[in-house]
Amino acid sequence: MWLGPAPWRPYNEQYVQGRWRGYHDFDSGARLLDWGAHTVDLCQWANQADHTMPVKYEPNEQNIICTYENGVKLVIDFLKDPFGDRGPRWITRLGTCPVRFVGSEGSVETGDSGEMVVKPRSLDQQRSSTKRVRGLDVSAHSRNFFESVKSRKPTVCNPTVMRRSHIACHAAALAWILQRDLTIDPATETFVDDAEANRLRYRAPREWA
C-alpha cells in the first residue's frame, strides 16, 4: 500500500520521510514535481498565465529556461547543495520555494520567510506606494479551503490552475531527463514533433491491491 500506483519495489527507508523526492518513480528525481509546483504556481500567477503554461523548455547545466508565448522566461535555477550535487533546490535562507522576479529596473526575491531581497535598494522605497496585486495573504490558504468546502465555490488556487502548473513542472522535468529542448502545445498538452517525450507523459499505474 505504501507505494500507491508507483512501480513495485521492496520497502526501503530511503524512499520515505521526504527522501522519496530524489527518485523518479515517486517524483521527477529532481524535486521538480513537488517543490516545483509551489514555485511555478507563483510564476504563473505573476505572469497572468493561469490559463496556459510555458511553451518551450531548454535544459542547461545551470538551469532550465521555460519560455511563455508572450516571451516571458521562467528560469528554474540549479544551486549546489552542501554535498556539492547540483540540481533544483527549493529551500534557501528566504524560506521554501523562493521566487525572484526580474524586470527592467531590478529584481525582487522572496520566499515564505517574509524576508525580501530588493535590488537595487532604491526599489524598496517604492514598495509602500506600489499597487497591491491580486491574490490573498498566504496565511489565508487554509481558511479559503474550508470556506470553499462549505460554499462549494472554487478555491483561489483552483484545481485547473494547479493542473497547468504541474504540467509545466512535468515538461521541465522531461526536458531535463532527456537533455534536450522540448516544445509543448498548451491546447493539446502534447509535445510538438517528439514521440519519445510524448510517451513519457504517461505510464500505466500499478494496481493498488
Predicted feature locations:
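Contiguous beta-strand/loop segments that form the cofactor/metal-binding neighborhood of enzyme cores
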Residues: 1-160, 164-209
